[in-house]
Amino acid sequence: MGKYSVLMIFIASSLLIVLQNVEIVNAVGCTGSFFNGNSSYAQNRRDLFSTLPNKVVTNGGFYNSSLGKSPNIVHAVALCGRGYEQQACIRCVDSAIQGILTTTSCLNRVDSFTWDKDEEDNVSCLVSTSNHSTFGNLELRPSVRYQSPNSIEPSKNMTLFEQEWNAMANRTVESATEAETSSVLKYYSAEKAEFTEFPNVYMLMQCTPDITSQDCKTCLGECVTLFKEQVWGRQGGEVYRPSCFFRWDLYAFHGAFDNVTRVPAPPRPQAQGNESSITKKKGRSIGYGGIIAIVVVLTFINILVFIGYIKVYGRRKESYNKINVGSAEYSDSDGQFMLRFDLGMVLAATDEFSSENTLGQGGFGTVYKGTLLNGQEVAVKRLTKGSGQGDIEFKNEVSLLTRLQHRNLVKLLGFCNEGDEQILVYEFVPNSSLDHFIFDDEKRSLLTWEMRYRIIEGIARGLLYLHEDSQLKIIHRDLKASNILLDAEMNPKVADFGTARLFDSDETRAETKRIAGTRGYMAPEYLNHGQISAKSDVYSFGVMLLEMISGERNNSFEGEGLAAFAWKRWVEGKPEIIIDPFLIEKPRNEIIKLIQIGLLCVQENPTKRPTMSSVIIWLGSETNIIPLPKAPAFTGSRSQSEIGAMSMSDDVFTELSCR
């Protein structure tokens, strides 16, 4: 048994290593309606596919064509990466076509695209088809991504790595979009760089040549953002869209870097010299008397520092009696400190809480815009004096947000609790809150479908972090459009954690007599029975999602909420009725998919609602099967009677967070 066992272990280990490094060779994404396999459309597509590989080569690497007449016309685009060999390009395009024809999710779908790659031939290529012309248009969806199975080692300095990686991504985007040539392969860039802790990092970007330079920059930027939001921390990854693709890795690929000069790592900070300050410039030692003088001065300084420490510690000890922020000592996950702001500093920043700096009025106080001495803009929430609930909110926000850090959560910079003042200082988010856009007829027109999709996905990621990915398990309890802030790039940030509830890691549900939240967004089991779980937040998310799609407030429908109205239209087979008129020309299938997700989130039975991790998977995939929803809350007689019987005080919490 001995030598055979060793041999089997060796073979199994080798196979495991191979499987871990196997790459998926093509990225296929399909959307749109279905067509009959025996239809004229199907025949036109087959005929177009039969000549496409050779046409790409004879046209310099990029080819756009159409065949047939409406409604059976087929449009196709094909592209081979720069530096290709002709036969390699032909094989790649043919492989891409086979991927479209054989992928289960693409069978007889009208819109399809694939970025195929052949590591052996060192070539990548694109093939896309549709029943409408995409030539010259920026196409961002569907998107497909892959990531390395391996994570970056925990011992690496991720803050430094991210800074260097961001700089490399920005350089590559700029280089790819310069388009100094009129070549059909003009939007292309390959870069090789040395990082402080990695000898070689490789990055490749390319766009189809039919779009503008600005569209190319937008497409590549969306690829980079998607990678960072979904799989950051991996040792490589790829994102493919119909108009562009992006890939980076720790090893060379596609033969794209053979003639690329490596960008050196940024200079490290200069080390301090070893020469003693007690030595004179000309190398002569300071005399005995000089040493005595230095010792005396240093001793005096130490005494002053000690006295100052005692005074500061005394003040802090008094403050700690008011609020306990745990053992974090005001340090967030980036190693930056949570500041205890001096009241004078806050007064100076807000011009003594000038009414001209008022951003809004909330349930527990007023929010002001402020500017610190270093020029940083902040949002300052001054809680109402003597408010018992405000005191609870203050302690809750500080104790939770000192330990949370995520791109889709608002960042608490510090606080002040001098005398009877309770003040929270946040990062300033310039675009106010989501409700200012989605419920305003004029501003809502600025929210494109792509922007709304990104906002919805960002909110979902923030919730996933709270429920599953952070060191804590937190239920927000007051999710609504006015508690979603939008930064300068319209990225969402979940805000207002005053009513949030901290769960133990193994705790899934709790009960409370203190109902905190806003009517219309609260799950029925929480509103009626005080039952709290992650599914309570999922319900609120579903309401917001439906508001984003319809552009209407949840309470805009007399006699029934938005969820009930959407459910009735869904059962009637007319879900498009609830779609915002500003979105009527947008991808209908995607919008209806999100209506379906929203209805799943607001189902009456909390166990039937999805987790936020499932929502993220559905949002990012074109191929996953999404279950059909059941009836939402408050649509049956049982729910209606519960509404009439339920007891609720005016415990409706803050309608405005820091903005």
Swiss-Prot record:
What is an example of a Pfam family matching this protein?
A: Pkinase
Which residue intervals define the domain Protein kinase in the entry? 353-619
Q: Does the keyword Kinase apply?
A: yes
User: What are the EC numbers?
Assistant: 2.7.11.-
What positions does the entry give for ATP binding?
A: L359, G360, Q361, G362, G363, F364, G365, T366, V367, K381
Quote the catalytic residue positions. D478 (proton acceptor)
Q: Write down which residues bear the modification named Phosphotyrosine.
A: Y426, Y526
Reactions accelerated catalytically: L-seryl-[protein] + ATP = O-phospho-L-seryl-[protein] + ADP + H(+); L-threonyl-[protein] + ATP = O-phospho-L-threonyl-[protein] + ADP + H(+)
Q: How does it sit in the membrane?
A: Single-pass membrane protein
Instruction: Extract one GO molecular function annotation from the record.
Output: protein serine/threonine kinase activity
Q: Which UniProt keywords apply?
A: ATP-binding, Glycoprotein, Kinase, Membrane, Nucleotide-binding, Phosphoprotein, Receptor, Repeat, Serine/threonine-protein kinase, Signal, Transferase, Transmembrane, Transmembrane helix
Query: Which residues are modified to Phosphothreonine?
Result: T518
Q: Identify the domain of life.
A: Eukaryota
Similarity comment text for this entry: Belongs to the protein kinase superfamily. Ser/Thr protein kinase family. CRK subfamily.
Please name the PANTHER family in this protein's record: CYSTEINE-RICH RECEPTOR-LIKE PROTEIN KINASE 40-RELATED, RECEPTOR-LIKE SERINE/THREONINE-PROTEIN KINASE SD1-8
Q: What is this protein called?
A: Putative cysteine-rich receptor-like protein kinase 39
Native organism taxonomy: Eukaryota, Viridiplantae, Streptophyta, Embryophyta, Tracheophyta
